[in-house]
Amino acid sequence: MQKAAPRLLIAGTNSGCGKTTVTCAILQALVNAGVPVAAAKCGPDYIDPMFHREIIGAKSSNLDPFFFDDDTLRFLLAQNGAGKDVTVIEGVMGYYDGIGLDSSRASTFEVAQRTESPVVLVLNAKGAGLSVLAVLDGFLHFATENRIRGVILNGCTAMSYPTLARAIEERFGVRACGFLPQMPDCSLESRHLGLITAAEVDDLKEKMQRLAAKAQETIDLNALLQIAKSAPPLTFTPPDIPAAGEHVRIGVARDRAFCFYYEDSLELLRRLGAELVPFSPLSDERLPEDLHGLYLGGGYPELYAERLEANAAMRASIRAAVERGLPCVAECGGFMYLTQSIAGHAMAGVLSGSCFDAGKLTRFGYATLTAQRDSMLFAAGEQISAHEFHRWDAENPGEDFLAEKPSGRSWRCAYAGETLYAGYPHFHFYANLSAAVRFVEACRKEKPRHE
């Protein structure tokens, strides 16, 4: 299958160079200009897509080259961008940074190569002059086919930009697409797992509008659209997704404590026949009525542990449901909620042991999970790509999967049973379609108990 898909990948020289700010400014400026736009994010990050979603009013896809083969990457990109004039893809870390310090595997560069996407590189030009060209020269010559077609200078001044832009275009033949000056009043705060979430930024819309207004003055949006239109059509074989079966209702925990979900994973569950019913473990007294399954995603339960403990009725409702066999997927923060306690605050108590602050990132990064037993989602020996990203650990993290990092380091993790997956690893259902199908089928088996 071949699909036209104008697209543009906003990459950075390094983490902290301003690519999220620049991406958000461009997205908001395009929306304000009436351009139909889609958004995507390289890698497994949950938070940046939340900002994209707030701006464009639609989901943002994750394009992760560790999770997906070429066909799936291109399918998700084409599906998300259908009917749009352009898809703006935000990179992750530095352009060439991948797994480990000496590899570009799973990097933004790999996404650009595998999706044949033209790249605009964001360089931090604060306090720099000719050195900006030296940095750009390195990025252009590090890889023969780097796909870099344009440059945006972040932190640049209106006085410096014309000279630097002219030098960039004359020396390298790369389009200078504009700059964004320093705007400290529009900065996005960070915490231990990256940016704070979009829902926690009180004046997010105002900040995005200020960024967009400046971008409309200083960034050549038409040049970006021209670069996006130069992208070749996407060629791929779409995944074989079964037709939707009998309708089921799956409760999805969605509030400030539980907000880490891949929107394409949720959409896949819908395509398979699931109605997703949102609820809040923070605010609601009990689970919604007539659920056939439960999805507890990740997030920041440790920041809301006192409030989660105080909602004893919800904790009891979830414990009773899981213990009676309601099919349940609980990832990272959702897994923590099912344990006895978080930092001494009582949780649902379905699983033994408590969670504690490890004081550092624990088992951070990509891993391949291999099921050690048959369970609701996986047959013994089956694998799925996953990632862990947390500073908290558990006394009993489970042992029903073998997790192995690309470096070869391995450990046992997660709980798996006939109606349960619970563990620190996050995964994307498009990384193993069978897991999504089995989850929905398990929910259908639960349905007769409610009739």
Features from the language model and the residues they span:
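Phosphate-binding active sites in nucleotide-utilizing proteins
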Residues: E246-E323
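C-terminal and late-domain segments of enzyme folds
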Residues: A112, E217-T218, A244-E246, F258-L268, ...
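Hydrophobic/aromatic ligand-binding patch that stacks against planar heteroaromatic rings
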Residues: A29, E110-V111, I168, L268, ...
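Internal gly/pro-rich beta-alpha loop/helix module
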Residues: G129-P242
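ATP-dependent carboxylate-amine ligase catalytic core
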Residues: Q2-T21, L27-T115, V119, L123-R149, ...
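A short helix->loop->beta-strand "cap" motif at the edges of active sites that frequently abuts
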Residues: S117, V174, E323-P327
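Cysteine-nucleophile active-site neighborhood
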Residues: P301-S375
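A short, charged/proline- and glycine-enriched loop
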Residues: K3-P6, A243-R249
